[in-house]
Amino acid sequence: MEWASNKKELEFVICTNLTLLDEKMVKYLKKHKCLISTSLDGPKDLHDTNRPLQNKELDHHAIFEKNLEMIRKIWCDDECASALMTTSRYSLGRFKDIIDEYVRLGFHNIFLRALNPYGFAKQHKDKIAYPVEDFILNFKEGLDYIIELNKKGVFFVEGYAALLLKRILTPFATGFVDLQSPAGVGIAGAIYDYDGSVYVADEGRMMARFKNYYFRLGNVNTDSYQSMFNGEKLHEIIRSACNECLPECAECVFQPYCGADPVRNLSEQGDMVGHRPTNEMCKKNKAIIHYLFELLERKDPEINRIFWSWIK
């Protein structure tokens, strides 16, 4: 980190479950302005169910809460640590509890996130997965609850809705690679693994853990920058990454607000183009965007005020 900072302008974020952090580590992170990203799946019972520690005697949620307080005290800033949640089967029906826990712990936003088809989530989908329709129903209920919190004076943002609203209500991009066309894979970002392998996205790296190396562009020890980022492999991926050209996406009324995801399509449906009628990402995005338009069409001044406060 110290070497890299002397070479170019960089921002660092460390991803951690907080369990192994101590004051010395946190002070080092603060010194180098390295922000902290963690995971919080809800109240203690739900968080510990979703994210069990190998040492069953440890109380994951209690350690999380204690170390979060320590981090904020050292930084003197509540925004130095952000959290992401993942929806498992056990989370369904409990979005209100999850949101309340985020509010209780001093977070001002949440990203109501469905399960992704990669890594251990895909490996254990028989235990933790659910129909996308169930997530959509829970998302709507969660969004309604967040709107009610804001009406009561509690400023709290639903992150995915805020990204979509920025695309709907303004001419500005969000930088969120899942809502880009062409997709951001390999052109808006790349992943460098510990062994020098370069992937178009972190999801490609996770697929490689299970012996699917399709999204590996090369290796920094053997391949040139030009061959990796202007090679036929990336060109082929990007050709399948523009929703203006994809079947059904090209004619979809929500196309300007959505994006393409060739990595997810290959993981879920076996090819980078995908099949929209059975595509879960497509179903989810259509339903959420449609619901946001429903809320906007109510012309409720309070809801409109809340939405604009999220994207300003």
Language-model features: locations:
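Flexible mid-to-C-terminal extensions adjoining Fe-S/redox cofactors in radical SAM and related proteins
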Residues: 208-312
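Short loop/turn motifs at secondary-structure junctions
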Residues: 8, 32-33, 77, 106, ...
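Short acidic/histidine-rich active-site segments
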Residues: 201
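Radical SAM enzyme [4Fe-4S]-AdoMet core and its adjacent flexible, acidic
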Residues: 45-65, 69, 73-186, 191, ...
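Alpha-helix boundary recognition
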Residues: 30, 69, 103, 229-230, ...
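Canonical radical SAM enzyme core domain
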Residues: 1-46, 53-63, 70, 85-97
